[in-house]
């Protein structure tokens, strides 16, 4: 069945705020609501005109389990506008867009607010199983004697916290952390530490240049409860260089590994939202789209090499549209790790790998001047629920700023999946 394009009317994101060893100033819903208000205020329709609100979130707080509905209500969409939440790990925001696309294509919706949010700095700190069992025993103890006997069984090790974020970033099937899967890719494709650090420094340099040139005008500034303003991504480093990055020690494969904090994406809080519409809604509401989503693909692969997800997801789109890697004007590949992005590029160049895993000859060399032109998650950050929506939105913004036409946004997904979206701009169309 032919894919019916869906229009992107507008989009916005929050600044991406680096987690700094303490809960950040905003809950995940706060990030999305402030971003959404800025986005909806500039539209010609009322929030109540939306068909639905769909939000991707990987780590909602316990009091915001259906965070999509919470956000819809706090944005003033009214009781009648449904809101719901999706979760596909790192691609949760992209999944929200795809869910909106499917609702629009089937005729159930015609105007949808979709995207993602996460406040990873507020990821839960959990109790160990031993502590939970002890608390259950304490709660069931009757009388001073039982209480005292239970108290004697409490050990200091029971109080050791369990970091929820670390558990979430570890694959329960293969038992590897996301960083360890990146080490697998660096080893498989012979990626040197120097290459990873050089790529990472370039991500910061491109992000700095983008900030200086106003390339991130999709950002809506945030204000916290104290009145402090957050206007731009705060994890971009002016002093990043391959030489400084080379001093950092490996994190996931000590002491011989290649993956460090410096060549990995940052743990970040942030939100990104887009307004999607049908052709009929564009006409009836006299909307001015910024672009179209032309195709979507999801893929599954070995969780131990999950970082190759962009290759598995975007290649079928290229095949369907008879495109080569460099027939697209720009690419956004989410930078979970420098090793992961470079492994994707190496895989496309490897004829034996392509024939074994894709059933195709090598696709060739992607021109890196087309890739992540304003930096990526290594510099900007990776709020898991938001990143998939961010790369789609920024791809359209980057294309429009350069008067270009088509691009691909692709993302790897913990658990061994990949997602990709082919987009084009609408500038100059009547």
Regions found by a protein language model. Give the residues of each.
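Condensing-enzyme catalytic core mediating Claisen C-C bond formation in acyl metabolism
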Residues: 1-26, 153-168, 243-308, 312-315, ...
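N-terminal extracellular/periplasmic Venus flytrap/periplasmic-binding protein-like
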Residues: 13-14, 25-34, 42, 158, ...
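Conserved beta-ketoacyl condensing-enzyme motif
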Residues: 24-143, 219-232, 304, 327-347
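Active-site-proximal alpha-helical scaffold in enzymes
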Residues: 87-118, 126, 186-213, 273-280, ...
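Active-site pocket-lining segment
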Residues: 183, 215, 294-297, 301-379
